[in-house]
């Protein structure tokens, strides 16, 4: 099995499948940077933490309420990276 990653169209056209048994979200971001050729560390992180303008979900659970960037992602998990939207 693989880790399924859903990315916004601004980062990649379509979903990706990563062949890995276990990674942290931080390691996944570094790997996705290599695969997409985009500096996702700069886009998704600010001062070593997850940017307030991005939400990352592992199996529907926001990593901010888990272990943050150290949240483990395992084979068979689904990761969604979405821009945060606000309005008023």
Swiss-Prot record:
Pfam families: ThiS. It comes from the Archaea. Signal peptide: none annotated. InterPro entries: Beta-grasp_dom_sf (IPR012675), MoaD_arc-typ (IPR010038), Mopterin_synth/thiamin_S_b (IPR016155), Sulfur_Carrier/Prot_Modifier (IPR052045), ThiS/MoaD-like (IPR003749). Gene3D superfamilies: 3.10.20.30. Belongs to the sulfur carrier protein CysO family. PANTHER family: SULFUR CARRIER PROTEIN CYSO, SULFUR CARRIER PROTEIN SLR0821-RELATED. This is Putative sulfur carrier protein AF_0552.
């Amino acid at each position: 099995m693989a880790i399924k990653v859903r990315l916004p169209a601004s980062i990649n056209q379509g979903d990706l499948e990563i062949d890995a048994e276990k990674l942290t979200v931080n390691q996944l971001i570094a790997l996705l940077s290599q695969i997409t050729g985009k500096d996702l560390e700069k886009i998704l992180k600010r001062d070593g933490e997850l940017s307030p303008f991005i939400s990352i979900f592992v199996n529907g659970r926001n990593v901010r309420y888990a272990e943050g960037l150290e949240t483990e992602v395992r084979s068979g998990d689904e990761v969604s990276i979405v821009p945060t939207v606000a309005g008023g």
